[in-house]
């Protein structure tokens, strides 16, 4: 479970988030939605520990980064928007490196990812280097590496970029399975049609603050738009930005 309470933070001398509070329950997929510059990436960077909050608290399963940084980080499986691979390491070596970093036995790591390697059709490419991978293949490697960890919280940032329709379908299926296992999932995306179908709840960020949160019906009530889709609500945010 992810709990964020009264989070204010951002970059040095540049506050971005202002008193942000929301939670992601176990077995829940929450969509983090907002215009560009709303604070989505900053929120993610605060959660994974790349930024230090000015004030407020972030807990995963009741644990803060300050209390035990190693245990806290082991609870997170992060799939970034932009794939970041080591050009000198093969796919196999990437998996081995992640396992080593998290203190996971190599045999267990490969047992965990074997179904994903087959699903993403990378099982015959374990000795390939990133230079031979397309952007979509690199994104699949990032997904596989996140699943090595077997975390309690998945943070998925714009997961559909670069993926073909089959891989998108596979990823949606994977996240659904993890939900059923009781994992918490926070997903930032602009693919609103998919988010509307996948997510149990939403957090709408606007200008660094939580504009509203809840399921689609609760968002409709907050915006006074009884029949709105998630895309309609996003467009309403755009109009608010222009005021």
Residue ranges and their predicted role:
Residues 129-136:
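Conserved ABC ATPase signature
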Residues 56-67, 71-72:
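Conserved ABC transporter NBD signature motif
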Residues 96, 100, 107-125:
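Conserved ABC ATPase "signature" region
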Residues 213-214:
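ABC ATPase "signature
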Residues 154-158:
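Catalytic Walker B motif of ABC-type/P-loop ATPase nucleotide-binding domains
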């Amino acid at each position: 479970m992810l709990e964020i309470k009264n989070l204010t933070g951002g970059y040095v001398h540049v506050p971005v988030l202002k008193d942000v509070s929301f939670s992601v329950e176990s077995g829940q997929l929450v969509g983090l939605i907002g215009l560009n510059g709303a604070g989505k990436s900053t929120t993610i960077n605060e959660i994974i520990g790349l930024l230090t909050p000015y004030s407020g608290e972030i807990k995963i399963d009741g644990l803060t980064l300050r209390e035990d940084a190693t245990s806290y980080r082991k609870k997170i499986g992060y799939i970034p928007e932009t794939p970041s691979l080591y050009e000198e390491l093969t796919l196999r070596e990437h998996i081995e490196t992640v396992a080593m970093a998290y203190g996971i036995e190599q045999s267990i790591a490969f047992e965990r990812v074997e179904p994903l390697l087959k699903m993403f059709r990378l099982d015959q490419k374990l000795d390939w280097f990133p230079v031979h991978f397309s952007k979509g293949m690199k994104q699949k490697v990032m997904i596989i590496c996140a699943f090595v960890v077997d975390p309690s919280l998945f943070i998925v940032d714009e997961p559909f970029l670069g993926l073909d329709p089959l891989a998108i379908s596979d990823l949606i299926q994977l996240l659904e399975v993890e939900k059923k296992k009781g994992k918490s999932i926070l997903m930032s995306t602009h693919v609103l049609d998919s988010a509307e179908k996948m997510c149990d709840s939403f957090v709408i960020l606007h200008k660094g603050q939580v504009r509203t949160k809840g399921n689609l019906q609760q968002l409709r009530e907050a915006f006074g738009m009884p029949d709105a889709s998630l895309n309609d609500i996003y467009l309403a945010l755009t109009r608010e930005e222009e005021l």
